[in-house]
Amino acid sequence: MLNKLIESLKNAPIIMKGDYPYFIHPLTDGVPELDPDIVREAVSGIIRIADLDVDKIVTIEAMGIPVATALSLAVNIPIVVVRKRSYGFPNEIVVDQQTGYSKGKLYINGIDKGDEVIVVDDVISTGGTALATLKALEKAGAIVKDFVTVIEKGDGAEKLRKMGYKIKSLVKIEVSKDGVKIVDHLR
């Protein structure tokens, strides 16, 4: 079911950013090119495991957008994109976000109190962006019914689960300088 996604992850090139092994994949980086079959597999997997009885799909700029858009088209639920720049709308939610390798602000528009949402993203690593987004959505009065990431690496998802968040993933990986190892995946 996730054959192309898994194979593409196993073949993903690794670059070193200092001492940090970083995998390059079309779904997480947009390069080299994003195979529509991989997006279809991801969306099919999300549909199988997600609670889609929601008002809106929330995704995080930039690489959550392709999967969330395809999901939106498949299930006819609108998307809210958490952006990296402000638009200055009156009810804009500003999110302070920090990951293992960057920090900055994120901006959420289009969320109303009582909205039931699912958060969909490409990858969760440290969990910093996910946690900041989840807390901001809760503060805005949204009801987060589910969080699904295509790829889980590192310990961020597990930390969030221990905090009581329901985090689901399609593929769990470990990354080393030698490559990507598939630890677990949706069957």
UniProtKB/Swiss-Prot annotation:
Transmembrane helix recorded as keyword: no
Protein origin, superkingdom: Archaea
Biological process terms in GO annotation: IMP salvage; purine ribonucleoside salvage
Compartment annotation: Cytoplasm
A molecular function (GO) term: hypoxanthine phosphoribosyltransferase activity
Self-association state and partner proteins as the record states: Homodimer.
Function comment: Catalyzes a salvage reaction resulting in the formation of IMP that is energically less costly than de novo synthesis.
EC number: 2.4.2.8
Class of the enzyme per the UniProt entry, highest EC level: transferase
Organism for this UniProt entry: Ferroglobus placidus (strain DSM 10642 / AEDII12DO)
Protein name stated in the entry: Hypoxanthine/guanine phosphoribosyltransferase
